[in-house]
Amino acid sequence: MAFYGDTDAQETQEWQDAFDSVLQHMGTERAAFLLEKLYQQAIAKHVPIQRLNTPYLNTISVAEEPAMPGDQDMERRIRALIRWNALAMVLRANKTGDDLGGHLASFASSATLYDVGFNHFFRANNDNFGGDMIYYQGHCAPGIYARSFLEGRLTEEHLNNFRREVDGVGLPSYPHPYLMPDYWQFPTVSMGLGPIMSIYQAHIQKYLMNRGLIKEENRKVWAYLGDGEMDEPESTGAISLAGREKLDNLIWVVNCNLQRLDGPVRGNGKIIQELESLFRGAGWRVIKVVWGRHWDPLLAKDKTGALKSVMEETLDGEYQRLQVKGGAYAREKFFGKYPEAAELIKDLSDEDIDNLNRGGHDPYKVFAAYAEACTAKGQPTVILAKTVKGYGLSDEIEAVNKTHQIKKMQIESLKYVRDRFNLPFNDEQLEEVPFYRPSENSPELKYMKARREALGGYLPARRKESEQLAIPELSVFDAVLKGSQGKEQSTTMVMVRLIAALLKEKAIKDRVVPIVPDEARTFGLEGMFRQLGIYAANGQHYTPEDQEQLMHYREAKDGHMLQEGINEAGAMSAWAALATSYSTNNLPMIPMYMYYSMFG
């Protein structure tokens, strides 16, 4: 039997059998050694090999998937209510003629990604645990508000005032703690802010642990991002730091709905494969969630590899068109590429083909990915979840190029959403696009409450106050305040003396953190290298060339000073994470970052 892309299937099978034999009798270490030797030999012989990509399939096999807990029928019902209320919030905001904007399609594509997190993974801060830290994708804010509405944390008045904040009862467009200080923990808009800030949050959490200022609790930093957002330089500019420092407390979930604001993210390529190679090269563990469980029987029957070949060959622009055109089109243009692939679906109706779901809409596949991500040791994890932009919002909206800009829906589209998600509205009620919240004693609300109680409390939530630091007397700065007495002094020299004075104060010296973007010598801070030590997540494994000097370059795992390299955005992100440590850790810190403003 010929495999697609294989000119000698028998020889291939012999190699695979030999590898399986080594694996069985000599173990994974020997198998990995042999593969590495073959790879090195191939490179030496100039054989072109793409090593950073895995097949366009789910990383976690069906056999490896854990059993999913909870009542999935109930969770599906709750997810439908959240979807509806998120949709209603945006539509009502644009129904009055004010055209306030908002986003329908982003949350529609990622509802399952959030739902599985809220029901099974996101742990809240409480008396016994510091809590996970979650960066929510900005355009998905309506969905988070909709969940809080069902939980009773927000009222219908709040939802009716989405993007109307003047009177104090409104909801901001995007996550921001300044606007909702009890609710949003982190700002994530403009796009690119969430990615870099989440990396440096994880970095600072490890820094504080390594200095013994907070305890190790296996807290996770989750960041929800978009595939289009990955084009922001801030999104991927710091991923090497996460890999280099082995930030296994960091989990990114990239919603790969294949579309950005105007059109496809990579119409002529495959964004999931591109991101996989990028993150694997930076030392991340990559978990791909490409196909939902309805594909599993077809893949199991794909003995020739024809279906897998079609999956590999199809570009993202074509996947988008397949979603728009439906089952009959997919039968001809996708499965019809190879007779063996077409044979796999001969007993499926066009509707059955339509129901072949993407991985990011399958709670079982998403749960498996999250569970695996939470076991990470020594690597950050990125989950690349394939979804449909505007999922469930009718054929007029799903996957079309203009979906991101749609703020209003026709009555027929609303009927489609109602019927698809089994919502309790008649045609007349649909005209008003009403919010819906079951009674307090309903099974849905009881289930939501129980799940959040099991995970420590409701989210999002933000601590506004923390322990107080002892403020030093002004006399601490006497040497500076009395002036230079006729001697010339630079402002940077004075600043260094102020920092040095604070670092001598017993009550706060551990909380003062000098941060430099590779400009310590410029500012005259090199004396702190040896005195404080430069933080290095993995310690110092070399002897610096200036070891014999008093102010030598000393790195240490418990180093006090942050040297972020030529990286002002990273230094500012580290400063923000430390400055808000009072909220995230109940640990006030005093970060001191001298920003070289002439280049800012």
Role assignments for model-derived ranges:
Residues 6, 256-486:
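Long, well-ordered, tryptophan-enriched scaffold segments
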Residues 64-86, 107, 122-125, 132-133, ...:
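Non-catalytic terminal/interface segments that mediate subunit docking, oligomerization
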Residues 243-251, 257, 281:
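Boundary/activation segment at the start of structured domains
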Residues 2-151, 417, 488-505, 509, ...:
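N-terminal amphipathic, basic-rich helices that act as targeting or association modules
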Residues 5-9, 24-28, 68, 72-76, ...:
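Hydrophobic alpha-helical scaffolding
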